[in-house]
Curated annotation (Swiss-Prot):
Component of the ESCRT-0 complex composed of HSE1 and VPS27. SUPFAM superfamilies: ENTH/VHS domain, SH3-domain. Residues 215-233, 502-512 have a biased composition (Low complexity). GO terms for biological process: ATP export; microautophagy; positive regulation of protein maturation; protein secretion; protein targeting to vacuole; protein transport to vacuole involved in ubiquitin-dependent protein catabolic process via the multivesicular body sorting pathway. It comes from Debaryomyces hansenii (strain ATCC 36239 / CBS 767 / BCRC 21394 / JCM 1990 / NBRC 0083 / IGC 2968). This is Class E vacuolar protein-sorting machinery protein HSE1.
Length: 512
């Protein structure tokens, strides 16, 4: 009798240890091996294990550690699916549902991620228990979740359903093209108007006056002239009654949107779809389907994404950009000195610390955390964008160099052998020519021979050689500069390689 009670205590202790191991706060993900060990232990002794398991699970759900609660919720679902009807009866009790599950939604100190997970578990248990009328408390808990805590339901936590990929019709493509052309035309008209106003103002600009009163009187007249020019400037291509301004709904097209921000997480396993996280900025490239656009993330990944998962990024006005730049300069010039001063005071001797000054500096610095974090995120994204652009540019330059190298190698490989092996013919047999041709074979290799040896008219083929010829060193250096030129020696045509069929067509030297 006492031995049986001791064995039950050991089994209870081992079950509690297994549950604590499966719901340990150091686990970053659900360990299903530990969870299945708990289920096997309860199934081996359902009478004692069920009550003991629910008791330990309830105590773990009452913990303040969010990680323990998340791991325990996963264990609860596994116990409901694998430990039989007794476990389901214990889970679907009013006390357990009310104290361990529904009460989490009213806890303000609990993170919303845990509340979303509790709502997901309630829905999952409701779908599993709804066929059994004896498990009605779980159905009641789900109805209360939908009615009172709808903000935590699974439909709200997840993103909307992705639209179907429908090919765009010709009308849609034509409409998009017309919209793009209209936006470009309006932009061009606005630019022309600005140039016309600027030109008109410069033409009508009065000469500077010496007196201040005349200058003050001239300024209102100039403003009236500018307003009159603006009012009289026609909009030639805009039909009557059509306004250049667009409603926000009409302006959100591929022609006007350049960047969008993700509203939800999207993890896709399709090769052509883009996966992203909530808050990511996507650069729009083109419209692929009716409700799908193609875009790229900051890290360079490219793919298509549904439009109901994103919202357009509003372009900042020049005033906002100027205000943001002023805030950055103030943060770097003034506030950074306060931070350095506070760090210096905190690292100094504690006996000489002025508590009032530290408190004042701390109170001035704490509100800067939001702005500082925003600027850090901004420049972090900018740095990542520039890194991706740099890597893409390096890849393109490398590809271009490879193509150029392959093109040059192919050109050298396919060059005719006659062009590379042909010696440059001449009728004058001089040592200078022979030594130059032996010392500079590459020069002769590059000489064009498009018209063939002996077939060229005129001296165009010989002019290149004489322009590149090195001055001879074997001549008498003491010869008179105005001496009469010696007549060339007569010599017959020299025989060269019989590879060239027209090598014997060269005329004699006297006939050149």
């Amino acid at each position: 009798m006492f031995g049986g009670r001791q064995s039950n205590n050991k089994s209870n202790d081992s079950l509690e240890q297994l549950i604590n191991r499966a719901t340990d706060e150091t686990l970053t993900n659900d360990n299903w091996q530990y969870i299945l060990d708990v289920c096997d232990n309860i199934s081996s002794n359902p009478e004692e294990g069920t009550k003991q398991g629910i008791k330990v699970v309830s105590s773990r759900l009452a913990s303040k550690d969010a990680n323990i609660i998340l791991r325990t919720l996963s264990l609860l679902v596994a116990m409901a699916e694998n430990c039989g009807s007794r476990m389901r009866q214990e889970i679907a009790t009013t006390s357990f549902v009310q104290e361990s599950l529904l009460k989490k939604f009213t806890d303000r100190r609990l993170h919303k991620t845990v509340k979303f997970r509790v709502a997901e578990v309630i829905k999952q248990l409701h779908d599993s228990f709804k066929t059994d009328p004896s498990l009605k408390p779980m159905t009641d808990a789900y109805n209360r979740l939908v009615n009172d805590y709808s903000q935590y339901s699974a439909e709200t936590a997840d993103g909307p359903a992705k639209p179907a990929k429908k090919e765009r019709s010709r009308q849609d493509k034509k409409k998009e093209e017309d919209e793009l052309q209209r936006v470009l035309k309006l932009s061009l008209q606005e630019y022309e108007r600005e140039q016309t106003v600027k030109k008109s103002y410069l033409n009508n600009k009065p000469l500077p006056q010496a007196q201040n009163e005349s200058q003050y009187q001239e300024q209102p007249r100039q403003q009236q002239q500018q307003q009159q020019v603006l009012q009289n400037q026609p909009m030639h291509s805009t039909p009557t009654g059509q306004q250049s301004t667009q409603s926000p709904a009409e302006s959100q097209t591929i022609a006007t949107v350049s960047k969008v921000r993700a509203l939800y997480d999207l993890i896709s396993y399709e090769p052509d779809e883009l996966s992203f996280r909530k808050g990511d900025i996507i650069t729009v490239i083109e419209s692929v389907y009716r409700d799908w656009w193609r875009g790229s993330l900051v890290n360079g990944k490219t793919g298509i994404f549904p439009l109901n998962y994103v919202t357009p990024v509003v372009t900042k006005t020049p005033q906002e950009l100027s205000r943001e730049l002023d805030e950055e300069n103030r943060l770097l010039a003034v506030d950074s000195k306060r931070i350095d001063k506070l760090l210096a005071l905190l690292s100094s001797n504690p006996e000489t610390i002025n508590e009032d000054e530290i408190t004042r500096l701390y109170g001035d610095i704490i509100p800067l955390r939001t702005s500082l974090g925003k600027f850090i995120d901004k420049y972090n994204v900018r740095k990542e964008e520039l890194s991706v652009l740099n890597s893409q540019l390096n890849n393109e330059v490398k590809l271009y160099n490879d193509l150029m190298d392959s093109s040059i190698s192919q050109r050298v490989t396919h060059q005719p052998s006659g062009m590379s092996m042909a010696p440059y013919p001449t009728g004058v047999a001089s040592p200078t020519h022979s030594s130059f041709s032996q010392a500079n074979p590459s020069m002769l290799h590059q000489q064009p021979t498009s018209s063939g040896f002996g077939n060229a008219r005129g001296n165009s083929s010989n002019e290149y050689f004489h322009s590149q010829q090195v001055p001879p060193t074997s001549f008498n250096q003491q010869s008179q500069p105005h001496s009469q030129p010696q007549p060339p020696q007569q010599s017959g045509p020299q025989r060269h390689n019989t590879e060239f069929s027209n090598i014997n067509n060269f005329p004699n030297v006297n006939n050149i």
